[in-house]
A protein has these predicted regions:
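Active-site rim segments in enzyme catalytic domains, especially the processed small/beta chain
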Residues: 85, 90-149, 157-160, 173
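Extended C-terminal subregions enriched in glycine
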Residues: 88, 130, 163, 172-218
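Short, conserved secondary-structure transition motifs
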Residues: 25-33, 188-194, 222-223
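Alpha-helical support elements that line or immediately flank enzyme active sites
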Residues: 1-3, 153-175
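Generic recognition of stable, solvent-exposed alpha-helical segments in well-folded globular domains
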Residues: 14-21, 46, 77, 110, ...
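Active-site lining segments that contact anionic ligands and/or coordinate catalytic metals
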Residues: 77-79, 110-112, 135-137, 145-147, ...
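Short Gly/Pro-enriched turn/cap motifs at secondary-structure boundaries
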Residues: 71-75, 127-133, 217
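Internal maturation/activation junctions in enzymes
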Residues: 4-97, 111, 214-215
Length: 223
């Protein structure tokens, strides 16, 4: 969907509106991904073009802007993401989560890890061979048949939007990876677009320029 926009030419207001619209339509489409032909559908450029044109038929959000109550800062976390590269050129992107409150609190002798407890919401809904729906998104980007970028994130449903925006900052705006990671991000949820606004984030617009945003302090804790 993003390939149909000239992202490098957008100002910040246009950028926020564009990503908000795209995230909304993409999240509405996610339930279709558990069907047998879901991979073919996800990779289809024609289907992406169809979704792009559907953006003109609906608006991303309808609420007026407002300060969101409190800060969204996770005090604890249970997801680990890492990327690693090796001398021989191999690269991995890895995301592992065990679920809240130390997972199942069960471990097997000698194995050294706790078992996860994150599939409770899926029980009875899947048949053998199906994969549980998840937001974790370990990602490897290639260019000219070679490695270009590896990344992922922790953060539940914000993972997908964060990874997408960082990749776009690198590819579409030509940023270095560290600068792309530092840029403020948005997150669309429940017909409201949340704008990251913690210390160090600078936006070049006033919140009333985008009528459907919420200003929110959300950030990942560094351990």
């Amino acid at each position: 969907i993003l390939s149909h926009f000239n992202i490098d030419e957008l100002d910040q207001v246009e950028w926020v509106k564009m990503f908000s619209d795209v995230f909304r339509i993409a999240y509405l489409d996610r339930p279709k991904q558990k069907y047998e032909d879901s991979l073919e559908l996800i990779l289809s450029k024609d289907y992406a073009k169809k979704l792009f044109h559907s953006l003109n038929e609906s608006k991303a959000s309808k609420r007026t802007n407002a300060e969101l109550n409190g800060e969204w800062i996770a005090d604890i976390g249970h997801t680990t993401d890492l990327s690693a590269s090796y001398n021989d050129g191999n690269v991995i992107s890895f995301t592992q989560t065990i679920g809240p409150l130390m997972g199942s609190k069960v471990a097997s002798d000698g194995l050294g890890f706790l078992y996860a407890v994150t599939l409770g919401g899926y029980l009875g809904d899947y048949k053998p061979g199906d994969r549980a729906n998840s937001h974790i998104s370990p990602t490897i980007v290639t260019k000219d048949n070679g490695f270009y970028l590896s990344l992922g994130a922790a953060g539940g449903s914000r993972i997908i939007t964060a990874v997408t925006q960082v990749i776009s900052n690198v590819i579409d705006k030509g940023m270095r990876l560290d600068k792309a990671l530092e840029k403020g991000r948005i997150y669309h949820v429940n017909d409201t677009t949340e704008i990251e606004n913690h210390d160090g984030i600078v936006w070049e617009f006033q919140k009333d320029e985008i009528p459907y945003i919420g200003i929110c302090k959300f950030e990942a804790k560094t351990l």
